[in-house]
Amino acid sequence: YEIHERLVGSEMCIRDRKKSVYGTVSYGEAVTILYFRNVLKFLGPEDLRDEIEKDVWELKNLDIKIRSNPIYNVKTLDFRKIYQPDIREECKKAVYMNLQYEAIGTVQGELTIMRIFSEYLQKEYSKIKSCSEIDREVLEEFLIHLSTKDTSHSANSSYVISLRRQLETIGKIYSYERLEHLFINTDIPPEVNAEFRVYSDDEMKRLNAEITQMDVQIARCLLIHQMLGTRISDTLTLRPDCLTRENGQDMIEIYQVKTKRYKKPISKELAKLLQSSIEYTQEKFGDTEYIFVNEKEPDRPMQYMAIKTKVMSMIQEKQLKDDHGELFGFGTHMFRHYYGVKLTEMHLDDWTIARLLGHKRLNNVQHYRKMSNQRMADETREVRQRMSDIIYMSLARWGEEYEQIRQDAGIE
């Protein structure tokens, strides 16, 4: 605190202007302040408390095997923004229990909604100190607040499910029976299906023209990702021994982070591109577990956020825009959509498409077929309109017997 006051008195900047990869501006603590925080932490006495007693957990210090996606770098869990001390301790116990059965990403979602809930309680129900005091009325008011909040996560069913899971776990641990029966099924809003978008051929050409000018291994990674049609996590965790040949056909083995491993045939060109990527990594880092590695930590895969930052910086620098005149976002899933739509245009059956995309079920294929039909309609609309105009002009010369046709078509 004294250092902070001295810096303020010296007119040294204590807040920095930061620009995100999306071009948005925010303000945060200056590098100088963060530096002093780290110095004080290093020089301060060692915290000998058990890890679960601390307000910030180092995951590596927990006696639990953490289930994580290796393309995301999650090192800590932060409870400091759960403002009520008793609720914070209750939340810690629940998080520790859930970590033994759930992936770290799921637990992070539960912790995020608990922070939002804690902030709401602090403002609207400041007398509530423990989860044992939360009743149905408080919950309903919060859910209304959540559903009307102007954020991208408003009324998101996953948030409500995460809150329910967290409060019910707390109820079981502390025998707060009320929490186990607090929610009813109608509390969970229906999921809003996101618009299923896909890049046009022109958009893909513009993107790839710039991607190929980026760092060679990142460019290879993104092109391979497009050609495989995999999830980005599956691409970034490809193994150096993934390539095989079966009956003269190049094959690739893909380890799906979410489900299982599977094989699929690939072209000779893609096999060569993969081989070049493997050789690049071996020459630069030696034997590694993954083809695309984190340069600072070669034992880990290339990180999703590192790729995202570089691609978005390129888009901002080049002012690269889509067909609607908007700057491109970083949509690795859009490459997968493009791949899926192309498979439907080849008239493959649903089972084959699902296999090539690594889907366990066939029901997702309908989205690709629907988008393919929509694209066909959009791309042929001008031609179909010209054909219709020619027909209507002919009808206009054919007399009264076709008057009803003209009226039905809305033609003057």
Model-derived regions: residue spans:
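Active-site-proximal segment of tyrosine recombinases
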Residues: 234-236, 330, 340, 347-359
